[in-house]
């Protein structure tokens, strides 16, 4: 007989602003059995995360108000539980993996200290016993050379590695119920498969229930027993996974299932001139030891990468987290030191100082993965987008800058009337459009796109890809597209480079690499996607 772990009964949640309450979760009912995985899917702003955070009462009250319904764990109410009862449940019986590890990990503490804290608080383990448990868990979530990484701080890890540490932190408590809010968003397909296998194994060992929030439908197919679809705060469809994927009944579910990235890259202009020529690019970070922190060695993270990129062309850079993708992008932007040759539009960049680089900078722009981190929360949209104009076109008046901001907001599909709002007032997809507008306003020739769609749900992802294609065709933009989502790469890129541990495994025309990969690692990535 199955045992109900969690029951959400007719839950409604609202946010109060002065005298009005805006309902963001409306009459939602969900149930999770022991050993079962329920996937919660839907676009950003649909109420998925608010529902999940409500389980452990992690939302600030006020402004949050629980308008109706209840949440029961083993039959006991969590919404009406005392703080002492909740402290006994949080982490011990119900653990949570958050989407953004940079917000969740303490930047001032080493990995070992943060992981030991979990074992000390929740399982009462001493440091000696905890050390082995920590190493084993880090190894299981795919952290290479785990013993050497224990003294690292969060900023010394790649985005995917930070997410794996977050997953390890949640699993160390051996919870009865795991709430996973987009836990594999920042991970490449190989590590993603490894994490999903680990979650399945632990679920079997512990008979653990799991609430898995994601916008990645391929993960839902592989992992979930049942699926609940949310739209505008309501649960519009709920069924077992096989039935829902085979015959969805709600129009919104049908739309979600049909929104996988598709299509071909935009046609290349003829003739297409070479815009970027990179030869033997190498990046190494110093290893410092001792009291005086002397350099004793170097960690080579990018090893002799060479490629050319033409005007109007997209080059995809794919590979597992920690493979050197983002480091390559930072080296091309001259934001970190590197060796080798970087020639942009006939101009060598490697030996230019900061002043000499300034006239070129507006022609090479970047859009980062997480607009929450890359957009200043204290500036409104007008101030964010016009910031580059203040640096590169200082003679423009405030009115001229505002006119350019209005024009570029139209171009990226944003309402210019919202230009005086702040980033927190926009959805994830809208924030990424703001980031694209900030890059586009300087009329660049090359945009480095570092995982620009990985944190977006499928419907919004498709809209951003369509936008990027139309902008590329209109302005003859070249893109360096960094991604672990091979479906997106296939739809956008003309050329592709596959990286592993800083080295080029395979490169060539995207159509050829996807149709007939030459290397085993590339074949593995494609098989897992």
Name each region found by the language model:
Residues 64, 78-95, 113, 121, ...:
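ABC ATPase NBD coupling module
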Residues 66-77, 340-349, 360:
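Conserved ABC transporter NBD signature motif
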Residues 129-148, 399-417:
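Conserved ABC ATPase "signature" region
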Residues 152-157, 161, 422-426, 430:
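Conserved ABC ATPase signature
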Residues 172-176, 441-445:
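A short, proline-enriched helix->beta-strand linker immediately N-terminal to the Walker B motif
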Residues 220-222, 489-491:
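A short, surface-exposed alpha-helical micro-motif characterized by mixed small hydrophobic
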Residues 235-239, 247, 504-508:
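ABC ATPase "signature
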